[in-house]
Structure formats: structure tokens, C-alpha cells
Regions:
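Conserved alpha-helical substructure of the radical SAM core
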Residues: 1-120, 134-146
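Flexible loop/hinge segments that line or gate small-molecule binding clefts
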Residues: 128-130
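Short, intrinsically disordered, charge-balanced linker/junction segments flanking boundaries
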Residues: 148-153
Length: 153
């Protein structure tokens, strides 16, 4: 039986929007058409604060912004969510999984300032440019690399 006190890590889906049309993604079918059963929705910063209040944030070790049905960087409140969470519990570890194809280099530099070294962003890079273009349709390989470099520097 689940006991709330045992909760240590949380997997969050803060959006189900994505700029990519990856053929293996559940958001898409028949070669990239959007799945009509998945509605485009985002959590707001208020949703985040309500669900992950200070009691929850102080109990857990960390959380993952994952993109099973959307890419977390598409959510306009992502950086604010990260700031809020680390302000409440500075020992939290935040992990973000992304295709890395959205946003500008400046946005990525700002996110890097919000997330110091102990946090992690995982960029989905599927091979070199030719292979990447097959599996991450709607993203540009060179842009993903530029964004990753902007975040790292």
C-alpha cells in the first residue's frame, strides 16, 4: 500500500505540447499526425505550486520533468517552476528530459542560471544529423547542439 511519507522522487508531465513529430511518440500516429485523443494543455505556475507545495517539495529528493506526451521546455512557466522549487528546497535535484529543439540560445543560458551544476538537462540527440532528422522530426540537429552548448556554457 502506498504511503505518502515514502515519496522521494516525482515524475512530472507539465505539458503535452511538443514542436516535434517523432514517429515513435504516442502523441503521433501514421507518420506524424497528431493524436486527437491528446489535448494540448500546460500546467501553470499556480498549478505547480498547488500540487508541489512546500510540504511536498521539502519531503522529496527531486523530480523529473519528462516528455512522454510533450516536451517540458515548451511550457512557458518551466524556468519559474524550477526557481520556485529550488527556493523552497535548495537540496532538490531537478532533471529535465527534452528534444532540445525549441527556444533560443538566450533562453537556454537563462535556464542554466536557474539550474546550477547539480541539476541535469538530458538532450535527446539521436545520432548525427542524418539519423537525428529521421527520429526527431521537427527539430534541427544543429540548433539542438547550439542549445545544448548554450546551456552548458
Amino acid at each position: 500500500m502506498f504511503n505518502f511519507d515514502q515519496l522521494e522522487n516525482i515524475h512530472l508531465e507539465i505539458t503535452n505540447r511538443c514542436q516535434a513529430s517523432c514517429p515513435m511518440c504516442s502523441r503521433n500516429y501514421h507518420g506524424g499526425l497528431e493524436n486527437p485523443l491528446i489535448k494540448n494543455q500546460d500546467w501553470t505556475i499556480n498549478d505547480f505550486k498547488h500540487i508541489l507545495n512546500s510540504e511536498v517539495l521539502n519531503q522529496i529528493n527531486g523530480f523529473y520533468f519528462c516528455g512522454n506526451f510533450g516536451d517540458p521546455i515548451i511550457n512557458n512557466d518551466l524556468a519559474e517552476m524550477c526557481s520556485y522549487a529550488t527556493d523552497v528546497n535548495p537540496s532538490l535535484e531537478i532533471r529535465i528530459h527534452t528534444n532540445g529543439g525549441a527556444r533560443s540560445k538566450d533562453w537556454w543560458k537563462k535556464l542554466a542560471k536557474v539550474l546550477p551544476n547539480k541539476h541535469c538537462v538530458i538532450f535527446a540527440i539521436d545520432g548525427l544529423a542524418d539519423t537525428h532528422s529521421l527520429y526527431r522530426i521537427g527539430t534541427d540537429f544543429d540548433n539542438v547542439l547550439k542549445n545544448a552548448k548554450a546551456f552548458i556554457q
